[in-house]
Amino acid sequence: IDIHNGKVKQIVGGSLMDTGNRATENFVAQQTAAYFAGLYQSKKLVGGHIILLNPVSSEFYEQTKHQAMEALKTYPGGLQIGGGITPENAGEYLEAGASHVIVTSYVFKDGVLHYERLRKMEQAVSKKHLVLDLSCRKRDGSYYIVTDRWQKYTDVVLNEQTIAELSS
């Protein structure tokens, strides 16, 4: 359940722009995020995710967050949440009903993997409630982890060694 500018959307990956709150849209739903959370719940689908696509600095962030919180209330324990998650706010989402928090940009800050930030997230929510998003884009024949709404490449190539290191 991707939420952008307070609406559930399917967007073209990598098209999000922080300036102007713009994205290329494939589809914009008329229903709320809570409606879709209810569908997940009625079909007994667990492990789906909610992604807040607006940064905290966006004028639409509060609308987007409100949609996310309503969805979590609709299906407590059934959905994960990501988008701007930090050790400081992760607990709020878990208390609201998220089963897990999803992080990328916080751990891969400025294109670099920061193990101390990963440890802080783990201390805040425990491994049991933490999902590390390893979304990638291909560059120069390798797949690099990307952050910040798929706009920024990290210096981390996704391979067996990377997965082994991060899972330990």
Go through the PLM ranges and name each one.
Residues S58-Q80, R117-S135:
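Alpha-helix-loop-beta-strand connector modules within alpha/beta enzyme cores
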Residues K44-H66, S105-V112:
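Glycine-rich, proline-tolerant flexible connector loops at the mouths of alpha/beta enzymes
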Residues G14-G38:
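Short catalytic helix/loop segments, enriched in acidic residues and glycine
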Residues D2, Y40, G48, I81, ...:
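Conserved, mostly hydrophobic/aromatic
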Residues H4, Q10-T19, L94-S168:
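Conserved anion-binding
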Residues A33-Y40, E88-A90, N159-L166:
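Short, charged beta->alpha transition segments
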Residues Y35-I51, A96, S168:
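Catalytic domains of carbohydrate-active enzymes, especially glycoside hydrolases
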Residues Q67-V101:
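Catalytic cores of alpha/beta
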